[in-house]
């Protein structure tokens, strides 16, 4: 959500810190918080003024009218405060319909004052700007401030000065206090704007001869502005409304939501409830809650929540397991119900999200059966058949009753089934989302008709008018429709061209496929803009043909080279969507902008709206999937994949236009309208934010003026008053076409505490903003309003059939659309094709949520403390080695890490480093010296000693044989060390191996060889390379993890040399860093260390 309430303490703390005013604000930071865990001695240490002043105490839990409820203790001593708190702190209280525990109180100094010194100030945000309210009589009996207070609208981007405040607000204020009040209100407004508040009320504001006192404060901030205000806000807390506890599970989901590009929401309403929901989509989640409450389940509804925006399988698993954990804590005598519902997704891979839910169900299958949980599933969208299949399979394998339904079932029908004694039979669905591969004109579930013109070209004035309006609406509650001067009634046509901001290749390909199936002459996407790469071209498909679409770094270049473009689809993130949209509106050719991002601060959205109105630009969004005009154009992912485009007949125009807030619900409307009428003419999802760029009425008026539109469908929502404009339009005769409308969110009036639904704007701030009030007003105005969302399809069909009967709509002949090839990647995901891979790997898999080494998740690697040796065992040998083997590998890496700067590898590395080369170049220079003469002895010694040992010849015979053949025994001999001056590296390794290895036959053989060679020359010892070689073979052969064939294969393919390469790389890097640290210059070898031996005839 966007606007969130903060505690009084938080509001005052921010105000005292950041308000800038000449008025003397008293009692700054003088407040003390008391909870059941408060240590009074510690509190007095921090706030010594508690002992010396009269005090006021009150709960700080978002409770309104505390004074009227007797929840304010006034003019008390500290002992009086303690006595006053005793029957209240930690005890239950009832406020309206809400019951909750009082556990957070605020103590402040008592301010003696008269009634004449109390004032009321409030600032709140609207679409047009911010209203400032002032009343000269504040306090507990202030009454209806909307009618009594002086009110001033400060427009978007306008400033509030002291003179305006005095002239418009302080009309009735005492003369001697006007200067102080004007300065304070001016500073308060600037503070409100700077810290992105959406609501700020002070009542009473007390002004005495000493200065200004802020007694009671209530506030909301725009939570989406966190990335802007983080420095000033700090870690701000958003307490739950009174009557609802804050649960750690809610905080956990909020944390997941904050770390994800998807949307994850959870509110616990009644943890003991019988009915639990796990719904996809901000709009759909509200509709399911409405339906449950309509059927009498309000007291059994346990939670509200939603997941949307294509969460990954892991994110959905985390979300699902949280809900399953909560619902299996307490048993219910009638068992429990889990509704896994959702509308038809636009771009979320249903199978991927369902696999996450299925994992959670498997993990909790025992608890689910113990608590007698029955699960009802309904979903549609990309790959939904596979999702439904895996959901049905888990029901069969676990024994949990899971009833699965697809798009052929009405979205909320499963709620009724949960109460019904019998479950209807589920008709078989296709095995995959690939219906568009074949001409499906014979199928009832996926019709394949097509056309490029409207069914009827009859005039708008021939359409049956809406029902006569009843004069019941108060004038001030129904603002007149906003002027559309300068804005086109037609946003899209068959020739519309768009620029897409953002590297959204999947969305662009979806638009091109839609264009192709609509038989457009050219693709609708002319270019893309992506500031993070240089100019280039991106490959896409136009039917079977490959095409190139240019990608520009700068928007100016894209606009200049494509003057025919008049639509921009903005996929920028919430942080850059504002700036990129503002830049777009500098180009006069752009008439429509769709903003997809969710989470743009409301204050910035209002600035976008103001500039768009000035420029005559229509904005769709923010927080939207976009819109669609069948047969012409679609925005981004709107309408989902091609199978849904065909099933909902979106490739050709119908006669019904709709507008909704929700993207998912707009796709559900596509489905409903296609099954009950001749199809969609145009549909727009204006977005779930509080201030959408264009409103319901903007689009309803467009549809009214469009001859091809014969009836209008509006899916309204709780929050805001835009739907009342439709009532006004009918009353004034501006709207004559039939309008079907239903406002979702009717359940909100049944809850005892306020619930913020999935959309930022879905929250009623007054009675007129509730869905129930709006539905009633619409009905009285003559709009066709169903009794519930369940009946929406029936009333749409009834109105449509009436228009057909009157001849206003003449159904046209259907024509099959062209077939479109399926993308290779999607076909592979659906399991329709297979292809031999070019590469194979068996040691690492990075594709899932967690990196996996040879089958072991990285979390397990750290949990088991496997170390570098253990990781090498997994990556080199595909298995988990014994602990001593891992330790031995690590010891080998340590002893081979370096051997001084004089050896060839280190020498090369140093020379490269001093020549100014980078780390990788210097390192590879050193590594390239490793071979038979340097570093290669590990492999050679292992092979040579193994061959001799396995052939059965005794050590003396082996030494004699090598001498006879004139070959050196690899791994024997050292330039400095000898039998009398042993190499401590070898000694350390030998002690470890003898202590931990189960058997060391090859090492024993090599030590016998050493006895023979050192008897002739004391430095012919088994050196560190030879020791590691033979000991490694012993480890491979005797640790129990390998067969003899596997052990020999690893020696043959050079695994042992890898130990030296990896170990010595550490030393080479050390030498590189050392030279850079010492700032050594270019190395040139001295002449006197070089013998110039030239041919004799040349030197003469």
From Swiss-Prot:
Annotated tissue distribution: Expressed in the brain, kidney, mammary gland, lung and liver.
Record entry for activity regulation: Phosphorylation results in activation of its activity. Glucose 6-phosphate, fructose 6-phosphate, fructose 2,6-bisphosphate, ribulose 5-phosphate, and fructose 1,6-bisphosphate also act as activators.
Keywords from the named record: Acetylation, ATP-binding, Cytoplasm, Isopeptide bond, Lipid biosynthesis, Lipid metabolism, Magnesium, Metal-binding, Nucleotide-binding, Phosphoprotein, Transferase, Ubl conjugation
Catalytic activity: oxaloacetate + acetyl-CoA + ADP + phosphate = citrate + ATP + CoA
Limits of the ATP-grasp domain: 4-265
Residue positions, PTM N6-acetyllysine: 539, 545, 553, 947, 967, 977, 1076
Function description: Catalyzes the cleavage of citrate into oxaloacetate and acetyl-CoA, the latter serving as common substrate in multiple biochemical reactions in protein, carbohydrate and lipid metabolism.
Name of the molecule in the record: ATP-citrate synthase
């Amino acid at each position: 959500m966007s606007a969130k309430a903060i505690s009084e303490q938080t509001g005052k703390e921010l105000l005292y810190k950041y308000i800038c005013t000449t008025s003397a604000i008293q009692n700054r930071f003088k407040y003390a918080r008391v909870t059941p865990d408060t240590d009074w001695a510690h509190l007095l240490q921090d706030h010594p003024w508690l002992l010396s002043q009269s005090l006021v105490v009150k709960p700080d839990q978002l409770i309104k009218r505390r004074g009227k409820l007797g929840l304010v203790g006034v003019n008390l001593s500290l002992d009086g405060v303690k006595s006053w708190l005793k029957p209240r702190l930690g005890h239950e209280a009832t406020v309206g319909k809400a019951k909750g525990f009082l556990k957070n109180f605020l103590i402040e100094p008592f301010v003696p004052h008269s009634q004449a010194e109390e004032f009321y100030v409030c600032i709140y945000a609207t679409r047009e700007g911010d209203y400032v309210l002032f009343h000269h009589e504040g306090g507990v009996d202030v009454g209806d401030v909307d009618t009594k207070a002086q009110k001033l609208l400060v427009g978007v981007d306008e400033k509030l000065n002291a003179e305006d405040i005095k002239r418009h607000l302080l009309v009735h204020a005492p003369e001697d206090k006007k200067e102080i009040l004007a300065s304070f209100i001016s500073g308060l407004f600037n503070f409100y704007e700077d810290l992105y508040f959406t609501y700020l009320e002070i009542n009473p504001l007390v002004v005495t001869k000493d200065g200004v006192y802020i007694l009671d404060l209530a506030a909301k901030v725009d939570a989406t502005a966190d990335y802007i205000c983080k420095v000033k806000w700090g870690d701000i807390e958003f307490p739950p409304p009174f009557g609802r506890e804050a649960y750690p599970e809610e905080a956990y989901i909020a944390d997941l939501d904050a770390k994800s590009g998807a949307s994850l929401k959870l509110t616990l309403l009644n943890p003991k409830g019988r009915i639990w929901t796990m719904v996809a989509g901000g709009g759909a989640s509200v509709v399911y809650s409405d339906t449950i409450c309509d059927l009498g389940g309000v007291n059994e509804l346990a939670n509200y929540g939603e997941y949307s925006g294509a969460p990954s399988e892991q994110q959905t698993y985390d979300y699902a397991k949280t809900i399953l954990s909560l619902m299996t804590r307490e048993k219910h005598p009638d068992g429990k119900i889990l509704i896994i519902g959702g509308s038809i997704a636009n771009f979320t891979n249903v199978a991927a999200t369902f696999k996450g839910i299925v994992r959670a169900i498997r993990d909790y299958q025992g608890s689910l059966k113990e608590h007698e949980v029955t699960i009802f599933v309904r979903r549609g969208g990309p790959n939904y058949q596979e999702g439904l299949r895996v959901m049905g399979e888990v029901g069969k394998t676990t024994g949990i009753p899971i009833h699965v339904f697809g798009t052929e079932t009405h979205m909320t029908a499963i709620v009724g089934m949960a109460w019904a004694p019998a479950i209807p039979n589920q008709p078989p669905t296709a095995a995959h989302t690939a219906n568009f591969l074949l001409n499906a004109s014979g199928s009832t579930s996926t019709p394949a008709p097509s056309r490029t013109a409207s069914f009827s070209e009859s005039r708008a004035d021939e359409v049956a008018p809406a029902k006569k309006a009843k004069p019941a609406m108060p004038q001030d509650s129904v603002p007149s429709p906003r002027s559309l001067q300068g804005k086109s009634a037609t946003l899209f046509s068959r020739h519309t061209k768009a620029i897409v901001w953002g590297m959204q290749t999947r969305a662009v390909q979806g638009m091109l496929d839609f264009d192709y199936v609509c038989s457009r002459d050219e693709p609708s996407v002319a270019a893309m803009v992506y500031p993070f790469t240089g100019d280039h071209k991106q490959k896409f498909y136009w039917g079977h043909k490959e095409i190139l679409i240019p990608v520009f770094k700068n928007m100016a270049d894209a606009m200049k080279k494509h003057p025919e473009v008049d639509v921009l689809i903005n996929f920028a993130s919430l942080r850059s969507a504002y700036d990129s949209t503002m830049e777009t509106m500098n180009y006069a050719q752009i008439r429509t902008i769709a903003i997809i991002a969710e989470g743009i601060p409301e204050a910035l959205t209002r600035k976008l709206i103001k500039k768009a109105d000035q420029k005559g630009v229509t904005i769709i969004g923010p927080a939207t999937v976009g819109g669609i005009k069948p047969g012409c154009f679609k925005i981004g992912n709107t309408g989902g994949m091609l199978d849904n485009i065909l099933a909902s007949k979106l490739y050709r125009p119908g006669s019904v236009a709709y507008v909704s807030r929700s993207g998912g619900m707009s796709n559900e409307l596509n489905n409903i309208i296609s099954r009950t009428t001749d199809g969609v003419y145009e549909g727009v999802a204006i977005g779930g934010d509080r201030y959408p760029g264009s409103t319901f009425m903007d689009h309803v008026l467009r549809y009214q003026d469009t001859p091809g539109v014969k009836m209008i469908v509006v899916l309204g929502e709780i929050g805001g008053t835009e739907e009342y404009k439709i009532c006004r339009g009918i009353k004034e005769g501006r709207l004559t076409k039939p309008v079907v409308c239903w406002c979702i969110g009717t359940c909100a009036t049944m809850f005892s505490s306020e619930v913020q639904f999935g959309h930022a704007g879905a929250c009623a701030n007054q009675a007129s903003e509730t869905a129930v009030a709006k539905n009633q007003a619409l009905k009285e105005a003559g709009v066709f309003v169903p009794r519930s969302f369940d009946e929406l399809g029936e009333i749409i069909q009834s109105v449509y059939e009436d228009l057909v009967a009157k001849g206003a709509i003449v159904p046209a002949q259907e024509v099959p659309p062209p077939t479109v090839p399926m993308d290779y990647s999607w076909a592979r995901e659906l399991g329709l094709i297979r292809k031999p891979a070019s590469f194979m790997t068996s040691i690492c898999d990075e594709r899932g949520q967690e990196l996996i080494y040879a089958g072991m998740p990285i979390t397990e690697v750290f949990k088991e403390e496997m170390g570098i040796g253990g990781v090498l065992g997994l990556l080199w040998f595909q298995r988990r080695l014994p602990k001593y083997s891992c330790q031995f590998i690590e010891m080998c890496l340590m002893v081979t890490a370096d051997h001084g700067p004089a050896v060839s590898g280190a020498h090369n590395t140093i020379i490269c480093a001093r020549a100014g080369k980078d780390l990788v170049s210097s390192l590879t220079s050193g590594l390239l010296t490793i071979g038979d003469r340097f570093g290669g002895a590990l492999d050679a010694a292992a092979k040579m000693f193994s061959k001799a040992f396995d052939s059965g010849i005794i050590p003396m015979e082996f030494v004699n044989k090598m001498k006879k053949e004139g070959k050196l025994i690899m791994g024997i001999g050292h330039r400095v060390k000898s039998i009398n001056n042993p190499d401590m590296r070898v000694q350390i390794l030998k002690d470890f191996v003898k202590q931990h290895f189960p058997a060391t036959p090859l090492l024993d053989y090599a030590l016998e060889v050493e006895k023979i060679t050192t008897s002739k020359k004391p430095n012919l010892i088994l050196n560190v390379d030879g020791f590691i070689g033979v000991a490694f073979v012993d480890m491979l052969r005797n640790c129990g993890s390998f067969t003899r064939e596997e052990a020999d294969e690893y020696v043959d393919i050079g695994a042992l040399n890898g130990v030296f390469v990896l170990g010595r790389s550490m030393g080479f890097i050390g030498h590189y860093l050392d030279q850079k640290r010492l700032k050594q210059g270019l190395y040139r070898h001295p002449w006197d260390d070089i013998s110039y031996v030239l041919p004799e005839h040349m030197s003469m």
